[in-house]
Amino acid sequence: MNADQVEKIKVETFHEAKRLASIPTNTETAQYSLPFSVAAAVVRGTIGVSEVTSEGLNDPQIITLAKSVGIVEDDALNAAFPARRFARTQFHLKDGRILTSDATEAQGDPEAKLSDQMIWDKFHTLTAPVMGSDWSNQFLSTARTIADAPSVMPLFGMMNIVPVRKGKK
């Protein structure tokens, strides 16, 4: 499925999540906008820095799809909250098909923890464009072995480095 195939999206979730149904105008509100997050994930396949900053906030395909996202409360999902934070999604496609997900929790929630590798990958994705790939890789290498190191000072020393220009390795 790709974004061009989607007519509308329905998200069934708990009350508190339904309250996050705005179309964002800045990074802070983008991070908490359920329609925007769903649309960005469908359009771009991810929700990263570029999706929640001006590039994503001004993407007409994301905005149009976000406006087609309907959020509805589900009694069973309300009952599970706050211990669990579920959502179920229906993608209504232009060809008439409806694709429905199971009730799932967001990746990174306590019940759907990120693996160490996913955390390292996210760190690298966020730091390499600012600090450079070499710095990011060296920092990760140092961090992975810090529990056995005699001191954390090498890691702290790396935190005092001035960022390189964007895109520099």
Kindly label every feature range from the protein language model.
Residues M1-K169:
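Terminal-appendage/accessory-domain detector
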